[in-house]
Amino acid sequence: MSRSKMSSQRLWAVRAQFLLLWLLLWAAPVPWAEARRSRVSLPCPDACDPTRCPPLPSCSAGSALVPDRCGCCQVCAAVEGQECGGARGRPCVPGLRCGAPFSREPSGRAWLGTCGCAEGAEGAAVCGSDGRTYPSLCALRKENRAARQRGALPAVPVQKGACGDSGTTRAGRLRTKYNFIAAVVEKVAPSVVHLQLFRRSPLTNQEIPSSSGSGFIVSEDGLIVTNAHVLTNQQKIQVELQNGAQYEATVKDIDHKLDLALIKIEPDTDLPVLLLGRSSDLRAGEFVVALGSPFSLQNTVTAGIVSTTQRGGKELGLKDSDIDYIQTDAIINHGNSGGPLVNLDGDVIGINTLKVTAGISFAIPSDRIRQFLADYHERQLKGKAPLQKKYLGLRMLPLTLNLLQEMKRQDPDFPDVSSGVFVYEVIQGSAAASSGLRDHDVIVSINGQPVTTTTDVIEAVKDNAFLSIIVLRGSQTLFLTVTPEIIN
């Protein structure tokens, strides 16, 4: 065989081997071929079928379940440094972004990237315990990993925002959207005042605190509305504003039947005022906010809804009352009396008056307050001073059958009586307190006349300079003499 023929055969053999090797490589699932196929984007279905989703996976630390690229199934998001994208478009955890490769892929192909910090995220800066401001929490963690590798102390995120931030940064989207109560309080609180009442001690002749309450400013020159039962005569009334300024107040008008009072301070500057809304427009279910100073804790805020807009006084056992109270589940505690009940517009729709139990409180409607202020203004225009009024200094209820049964259930020693007026609070420092009346006494007679309703007591106070009262207390029958206080 000639040499040229042998060389030709060897050449064809080599070519055949290369061809066979190429065919084998093309058919075999080698890694680079599999990687190439994985970079082809999988199409999203026309309609999601949750039953075809795989079981929920257990995500590694730092990861979280998020919707996949198509929004059909839940997948574990990639954390920093892990691959993202690919055929199924694996997402990164919130706060990270999937970094794209430098080369542009053809249309319809998916690229594999790496999750990393989202640079330049607005408002994502954090302050570290090392005093440095990092562009994001992700950037701080990246620095911490490098610090641990070189044996340095990692920094702890101590504050959202720059280290020099004074804390007055704008609230986040959710806080801005849902914290409507805070917006109401910010608007209303400067007009709410704390009332501290003092009485003179008979032993030391010094003024000592006797009770407290709340009120709200209705005129720039210092007129303040509160509850009548908050005030007692012959006492010093000290008003403290939100800014801490203190003034002594005088009583301008008082109506014990409405349980409303108007006092006046002499401020150095104009004061912020609250406007009265229309309680007749109030609807059951509306959000309301109660502000005041319960237990002398100033600037206390509670919120709730209106349970009913017209709870008649007769339903509360107040047979002589013609007021339809606003019932709310906003908590009104002792000391909250006289504070405003406002709607979400910041308008006063009631004055906090009475708490029966947790979740059941009552307010006098603003329409009654408006009429009270209008009557006062009319008297001022006509030059008429308000009539002298007498003040006993107690809060009372007619002793109904239901109330009698409840009191006997709570106190086995409660007087065995079928009618009378139940005293549920005696105002400290008042004429009633000085005479010896106590909480939970039962008044059965005044000046020889039987007493069955609160109207009997009010009329007796109005028509007499002094009162001879028969009181039942437990198993005792007491005879007390009371001289009502005169209020101008």
Curated annotation (Swiss-Prot):
Disulfide bonds join C44-C70, C48-C72, C53-C73, C59-C76, C84-C98, C92-C115. Transmembrane segments: none annotated. One of its GO terms (molecular function) is endopeptidase activity. Keywords: Disulfide bond, Hydrolase, Protease, Secreted, Serine protease, Signal. It is found in: Secreted. Its EC number is 3.4.21.-. Residues 384-476 form the PDZ domain. The keyword Transferase does not apply. The keyword Protease applies. GO terms for cellular component: extracellular region. Residues 1-35 form the signal peptide. This is Serine protease HTR4. The lineage of its organism: Eukaryota, Metazoa, Chordata, Craniata, Vertebrata. The gene is Htra4.
